[in-house]
C-alpha cells in the first residue's frame, strides 16, 4: 500500500513537469528525412515532378530527393552531373514567365 501511494505521488509530480517539456516549436520535433544510399541509375527528367535538397546536419550525407510523377521519392548524389542537370531542368520548368 505504501509503495502504491509513493508511486502515485511520483507520477503526479512527473505529470506536472511533462507539459513544459512538450511545449516546444514544431520545427524542433519535425522528422528529418535522410538519404543513406543513392540511386545508381540516371532518372529521365520526364519522370521527375520535383526535388528537394537535404542539407541537415543530422543526416550523414547531403542529398537530393527527387519526387517522380508517380510520387516515388528517390535519393540522388548532388555531386553527379545528371543530378545537377535534372535540378536545373526542374527549376526552369517551375519558373514563371516574366511579363
From Swiss-Prot:
Q: What does this protein do?
A: Acts as a ligand for C-C chemokine receptor CCR2. Signals through binding and activation of CCR2 and induces a strong chemotactic response and mobilization of intracellular calcium ions. Exhibits a chemotactic activity for monocytes and basophils but not neutrophils or eosinophils. May be involved in the recruitment of monocytes into the arterial wall during the disease process of atherosclerosis.
Q: Protein name, please?
A: C-C motif chemokine 2
- At the top level, the lineage of the source is Eukaryota
Instruction: Spell out the family assignment given in the record's similarity comment.
Output: Belongs to the intercrine beta (chemokine CC) family.
Q: Impact of changing residue 81 to A on the protein?
A: Strongly reduces heparin binding
Lineage at the top is: Eukaryota, Metazoa, Chordata, Craniata, Vertebrata
The site feature described as Involved in dimerization, receptor binding and signaling is recorded at: 36
Encoding gene per record: CCL2
Glycosylation positions in this chain: 37
Listed result of changing residue 33 to E:
Slight reduction in affinity
Result when mutating residue 51 to D: Loss of activity
User: GO CC terms for this protein?
Assistant: extracellular region; extracellular space
Name the consequence of residue 31 to A. Loss of dimerization; slight reduction of activity
Pfam families from the UniProt entry:
IL8
InterPro entries on file: Chemokine_b/g/d, Chemokine_CC_CS, Chemokine_IL8-like_dom, Interleukin_8-like_sf
Q: Which GO terms describe its biological process?
A: angiogenesis; animal organ morphogenesis; antimicrobial humoral immune response mediated by antimicrobial peptide; astrocyte cell migration; cell adhesion; cell surface receptor signaling pathway; cell surface receptor signaling pathway via JAK-STAT; cellular homeostasis
Query: What does altering residue 50 to Q do?
Result: 40% reduction in activity
- Recount the UniProt induction comment for this entry: Up-regulated upon hypertonic conditions. In pancreatic islets, secretion is stimulated by IL1B. Up-regulated by coagulation factor Xa (F10) in PAR-1 (F2R)-dependent manner in cardiac fibroblasts and endothelial cells. Up-regulated by thrombin (F2) in endothelial cells.
Pinpoint the site Involved in GAG binding. 41-42, 81, 89
Please describe, based on the UniProt annotation, the reported consequence of changing residue 53 to L: Loss of activity
User: Where does the record say this protein resides?
Assistant: Secreted
**SUPFAM superfamilies referenced in this protein's UniProt entry, alphabetically:** Interleukin 8-like chemokines (SSF54117)
